[in-house]
A protein has these predicted regions:
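ABC ATPase C-loop
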Residues: 152-153
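Conserved ABC transporter NBD signature motif
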Residues: 56-64, 76, 109, 113-118
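ABC-type ATPase nucleotide-binding domains, specifically the catalytic core motifs of the NBD
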Residues: 12, 30, 68, 93-116, ...
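The feature captures the beta-strand-to-loop junction immediately N-terminal to the Walker
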Residues: 33-35
Length: 247
């Protein structure tokens, strides 16, 4: 479904991604793990057009999307849940979800279909329905994360990009969100690319994983193998979180 070929992305003179290549199959959950500053968020932003690639190619369903603007990439079927949630705090839950479907309204899609999709979001996250008229800024962090995911789903994506969805949340809330991600894959066929600080939880959820260091992919493989990899264990899964990739 998604393929990155030799992607190089820059922030000014800073070479953030260095010849990154990866792929996701239809219906897969794939996770990116690595230390802070490794380039995980930059990969998501490059895919979604927020930080365009300097060179290389992004293919979605075999179509090049590298040079497209973010709104066109959303229309193609890619939605991103940003780090830090970034909900519209002065607006209600329902208004936030409506904004997630903004491009669908602009294309004059049947409003009944959009309302049906909102009902499906409420089925995934019942607390959002209970608080549909509540201002987003008055909600807990976990509820805001649910809202951010629901807002992304309102664009009706085939590929969902998630950036650190567990950040700052209680373990029970994280478990609930991860159950929803698995349900989206199982029941709706949504493909998921997950950036996650909780490497162990992410690898248990995902089919495959990539390990990044300083803008390069240094390891990849099935999640079960990465969970048993000695270096991954030492760097991300055990008590000793010290960076070990430096040689």
């Amino acid at each position: 479904m998604l393929r990155l070929k030799n992607i190089n992305t820059y922030y000014g003179k800073v070479h953030a991604l260095k010849n990154v290549s990866l792929h996701l199959g239809e219906g897969e959950i794939v996770t990116l793990i690595g230390a802070n500053g490794a380039g995980k968020t930059t990969i998501l932003n490059t895919i979604s057009g927020v930080t365009p690639a300097g060179s290389g190619e992004v293919l979605f369903r075999k179509e090049p999307v590298t040079a497209l603007t973010s709104d066109k990439i959303v229309k193609y079927g890619i939605s991103q849940v940003p780090e830090g949630r970034q909900v519209f705090k002065p607006l209600s839950v329902e208004d936030n979800l409506e904004l997630g479907a903004y491009l669908r309204y602009r294309s004059r899609e049947d409003r009944a279909v959009i309302r049906r999709d909102m009902t499906q979001v409420f089925a995934l996250f019942p607390r959002l329905e209970e608080r549909r008229r509540q201002l987003a800024g008055t909600m807990s962090g976990g509820e805001q994360q649910m809202l951010a995911i629901g807002r992304a789903l309102m664009a009706n994506p085939r590929l969902l990009l998630l950036d650190e969805p567990s950040m700052g949340l209680a373990p029970m809330v994280v478990q609930e969100i991860f159950r929803v991600l698995e349900r989206l894959r199982r029941e709706n066929g949504v493909t998921i690319l997950l950036v996650e600080q909780n490497a162990k939880a992410a690898l248990k959820l995902a089919d495959r994983g990539y390990v990044l260091e300083t803008g390069k992919i240094i390891l990849e493989g099935p999640s079960a193998e990465l969970l048993e990899n000695a270096e991954v264990k030492r760097a991300y899964l055990g008590k000793d979180k010290k960076e070990i990739w430096e040689r």
